[in-house]
Amino acid sequence: MESKALLVLTLAVWLQSLTASRGGVAAADQRRDFIDIESKFALRTPEDTAEDTCHLIPGVAESVATCHFNHSSKTFMVIHGWTVTGMYESWVPKLVAALYKREPDSNVIVVDWLSRAQEHYPVSAGYTKLVGQDVARFINWMEEEFNYPLDNVHLLGYSLGAHAAGIAGSLTNKKVNRITGLDPAGPNFEYAEAPSRLSPDDADFVDVLHTFTRGSPGRSIGIQKPVGHVDIYPNGGTFQPGCNIGEAIRVIAERGLGDVDQLVKCSHERSIHLFIDSLLNEENPSKAYRCSSKEAFEKGLCLSCRKNRCNNLGYEINKVRAKRSSKMYLKTRSQMPYKVFHYQVKIHFSGTESETHTNQAFEISLYGTVAESENIPFTLPEVSTNKTYSFLIYTEVDIGELLMLKLKWKSDSYFSWSDWWSSPGFAIQKIRVKAGETQKKVIFCSREKVSHLQKGKAPAVFVKCHDKSLNKKSG
C-alpha cells in the first residue's frame, strides 16, 4: 500500500511539473508573439500623472495585475504626436490628471512611441502605421486574454497620434467605443486614403477638434478636411485667440517646420486644452453649431439646435452619427474656461436716400439680468439702405436674459470730407437677437419708434419690445 501511495504521489508531482512546464512554455510563446512591439503602454495613476511607473506588457498577463488595471472600468489611451525633443510634452500629465478627475476609477494609459516620434516629420508620419498596429495588438490581447470589452476603450490621439489611433481602431477585432482626434496632423494625411489616417470607420464614434488648419491643404499643421462623425472647428479652425499668428507664419516661411515647434504649439495644442476644459467644467460645456461654412457661421446664420444642429464640445459630446461628417463651429475665449455665449443679430437699415458704405465698424452693448457686455466691436463688409444684415457676436460672460442693447456706428480712422459736411445715417426700428446657448429669440424696439443711427454720433438705444408674441423661444 505504501509503495502504491508513493507511486501516486510521484505521478502527481510529475504531472504538476509537466503542466507548469507547458504553462511556462505557453507564456514564453505568448511573449514572443509580441516581442516586436516597440510602443510602450504605461498605466499612470491619479497620484502620479507625470511618470510612467508601471507598464502593461503585451503577452505578460502578470503585468496587468501588477499595475492594478481595473477590469470593470473604462480605459483611456492617450497617444502623443511628433516631438522635437524626444520627451513628453507638458500637456500629457495635464490631460491624464483631468481624465482621472472626471473618471476616478478609470484606467489612463499613455502610449509611448517617443523613439519613433522624434525622427524627421515624414519618417515619423510613416511610423504611425506601426504605432497603430502596436496599439491594436495590445487592445486585441486585452480582449482575448482578459475578455476586456472594447466598448470601454476610448482612444485620444493628438496630431500624428490621432492618425495612429485611427489606424489602431481599424485593426482591432471589434470596434472601440470612441476615438477623439485632437487636431490630427495635416502634412502627409490631407489627401491620404481612409485606411492610412483617422476616419469615421475607425470606432463606434469619432469626434475631431481642428484648431490649426491655416494654410493651403496639405501644408497646414492640422488636417483641414473632416475625418470624423463630428468635426468641430473652434474659431474657424484656422488659428486660436491668444496665439501670435504673425510670428508663426514668419518663422514657418523663413525656416520651415523644423524650428516652429514652440510657435505652433499654441494653436495646435489648443485642441488638447479645449478637451481638458470639457473634462474639468462639465456643467458648462461649450456649444458648437453645425454650419455649411465658417463664413455663414460668422453671419450668425447657424445658431440652431434643431435636429442635432448643435452639440457639446469635448467629453460630453452627443454621439450623433450622420451619413456625412458634420462640420461644426464655435467661438472661444483665449484661455480656460473657453466657453463663450453666441448671439445672432439682425438689423434692417432704412432710409429715404440710397446709401452704401463698405467695411464699416460698429460697437454693440448688451445688458441683461445677470451682467452686461459693452462695446463689442464688429465690422460689416457693406451697409446699404433698405437692406437687412445678419452677423455673429459673442460675450465672454453670461449676461442672463437680455433686456436692452445699444448700437454705435464708429467714425472712420481717417478723415473724410463727406463725413465732415454731412453725417451718414440710417433709421432703425427693430433689432432681432437670437441667443445660441438658450435658443431664445428677442426683439428690441427703439425707445422712440425709430432710432436714427448716425456715424460717429451717440449710440442708439433699444429695449425689449413689450409685445410678448414677438419674443419667444425657438429651436
Curated annotation (Swiss-Prot):
Domain spans labelled PLAT: 341-464
Consequence of substituting V208I: In HLPP1; decreases the specific activity of the enzyme; has a mild effect on the secretion of the mutant enzyme; the total LPL mass is reduced compared to that of the wild-type construct
Share an example GO biological-process annotation for this protein: positive regulation of tumor necrosis factor production
**Gene Ontology molecular function: any one:** heparin binding
Impact noted for substituting D231E: In HLPP1; loss of activity
Q: Which residues bind Ca(2+)?
A: A194, R197, S199, D202
Q: What is the effect of changing Y289H?
A: In HLPP1; no enzyme activity
What are the disulphide bonds in this sequence? C54-C67, C243-C266, C291-C310, C302-C305, C445-C465
Summarizing the annotation, the consequence of altering H268G is:
Loss of enzyme activity with triolein and tributyrin
Effect caused by changing K434N? Impaired heparin-binding
What regulates this protein's activity? The apolipoprotein APOC2 acts as a coactivator of LPL activity. Ca(2+) binding promotes protein stability and formation of the active homodimer. Interaction with GPIHBP1 protects LPL against inactivation by ANGPTL4. Inhibited by NaCl.
Q: How does it assemble?
A: Homodimer. Interacts with GPIHBP1 with 1:1 stoichiometry. Interacts with APOC2; the interaction activates LPL activity in the presence of lipids. Interaction with heparan sulfate proteoglycans is required to protect LPL against loss of activity. Associates with lipoprotein particles in blood plasma. Interacts with LMF1 and SEL1L; interaction with SEL1L is required to prevent aggregation of newly synthesized LPL in the endoplasmic reticulum (ER), and for normal export of LPL from the ER to the extracellular space.
Q: What does this protein do?
A: Key enzyme in triglyceride metabolism. Catalyzes the hydrolysis of triglycerides from circulating chylomicrons and very low density lipoproteins (VLDL), and thereby plays an important role in lipid clearance from the blood stream, lipid utilization and storage. Although it has both phospholipase and triglyceride lipase activities it is primarily a triglyceride lipase with low but detectable phospholipase activity. Mediates margination of triglyceride-rich lipoprotein particles in capillaries.
Q: What protein does this entry describe? A: Lipoprotein lipase
Q: Give the classification, highest ranks.
A: Eukaryota, Metazoa, Chordata, Craniata, Vertebrata
